[in-house]
A protein has these predicted regions:
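Structured catalytic-domain cores with a bias toward divalent-metal coordination
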Residues: 1-194
Length: 194
């Protein structure tokens, strides 16, 4: 029964990522492996799962609000920015950017706020993408994803880990194509093997 529960939990976790391309047996197996590995891993040697896309705001907003509460940063105005899993129709883009900029400024004065600041940056990335056309938005999205992967690598390097494993849609991880995909951008960095 435990193996079945673990397999089901892994499938749920894969589905929770939100993108249908990850609702696969292979992703469920990867998550299951990570869970099993972490059960016996030494402290600091556990595997972590990060997201680098900014298309969905719900997790970034949730983690930002949790971090703000821990750091004693008021979340009242952040609460007004969202309705469920989307931006509130009550707040226009300039209000959203102004609120996020103010929260970021307050977080920058707090120790231990690096992750929270990154969540603000991701929410600002999402906001900026909404103002662009499809072609411009696709290019900028991949640029943001490359920046976010670099941020993840920096976090892991701070923990003494020199390598990360990145998975994504072929059009994003590829280093070929007519536009600067995340993979193409990262392949220009000597620290990245694509």
């Amino acid at each position: 029964a435990d193996a079945n529960e673990a397999a089901y939990a892994a499938q749920e976790a894969a589905a929770a990522i939100g993108f249908s391309i990850y609702r696969t047996e292979e992703m469920a197996e990867l998550i299951s492996y990570m869970r099993q590995y972490n059960e016996s891993a030494l402290e600091g040697e556990d595997l972590r799962f990060y997201g680098f896309d900014m298309q969905r705001i719900s997790y970034s907003m949730r983690f930002l609000k949790e971090s703000c509460k821990e750091l004693e940063v008021d979340t009242t105005n952040l609460q007004k920015l969202v309705e469920g899993e989307n931006w509130s129709s009550e707040c226009d883009l300039s209000t959203r950017i102004e609120t996020l900029t103010q929260v970021k400024k307050e977080l920058e004065s707090k120790n231990g706020s690096e992750n929270a600041i990154h969540f603000v940056d991701i929410l600002m990335q999402h906001s900026e993408l909404q103002t662009l056309t499809n072609a411009d938005g696709a290019t900028l999205r991949d640029q943001f994803m490359a920046e976010n992967v670099q941020w993840i690598l920096q976090q892991e390097q701070r923990n003494g880990h020199e390598k990360i494993f990145v998975t994504g849609h072929n059009s994003h991880v590829a280093k070929w194509g007519s536009f600067d995909s995340m993979g193409k951008l990262l392949s220009k960095d000597a620290a990245c093997l694509i």
